[in-house]
Curated annotation (Swiss-Prot):
Its main location: other. The lineage of its organism: Eukaryota, Fungi, Dikarya, Ascomycota, Saccharomycotina. GO terms for cellular component: nucleus; peroxisome. It catalyses: S-ubiquitinyl-[E1 ubiquitin-activating enzyme]-L-cysteine + [E2 ubiquitin-conjugating enzyme]-L-cysteine = [E1 ubiquitin-activating enzyme]-L-cysteine + S-ubiquitinyl-[E2 ubiquitin-conjugating enzyme]-L-cysteine. This is Ubiquitin-conjugating enzyme E2-21 kDa. The gene is PEX4. It comes from Saccharomyces cerevisiae (strain ATCC 204508 / S288c). GO terms for biological process: peroxisome organization; protein autoubiquitination; protein import into peroxisome matrix, receptor recycling; protein monoubiquitination; protein polyubiquitination; protein ubiquitination. SMART domains: UBCc. Keywords: ATP-binding, Nucleotide-binding, Peroxisome, Peroxisome biogenesis, Transferase, Ubl conjugation pathway. Residues 17-179 form the UBC core domain. It is an enzyme of class 2 (transferase).
Amino acid sequence: MPNFWILENRRSYTSDTCMSRIVKEYKVILKTLASDDPIANPYRGIIESLNPIDETDLSKWEAIISGPSDTPYENHQFRILIEVPSSYPMNPPKISFMQNNILHCNVKSATGEICLNILKPEEWTPVWDLLHCVHAVWRLLREPVCDSPLDVDIGNIIRCGDMSAYQGIVKYFLAERERINNH
């Protein structure tokens, strides 16, 4: 269990508002994700983990999400990197997939960059928290937005309605990813 007193009194990288907010969120994340109760943990089977990479620095986080059922991402897990700016919660965190980890119309595969409206400064509201942001990324896997693609080719396939081609390409990509990672 992290020493929250030390975290709350650490001011090296961020503002008091940011540190106070992120420590509160961390406590909620630990409690929520530890619960087996589906009401207390609506993210069960969605967000497998959400933790700071280093418990002494709450500016960098890592999440593991499960691919949504009935999508080509089903039965796969994806690592998400989260950078919390010192201006959080007034500005959004920067969230990206691990490089070359996923093929999706709203993700630039080479960098992991995600195109998601709530993560844009002009759309962001401090009401959102890290759990909700990670859940929104998971929902993007379920419901791609082909009108704002970072991968234009995948976006065009979806826009044309060729879902079997989309699913086939993604499944092939993920099978290759798994094959490479197992060697």
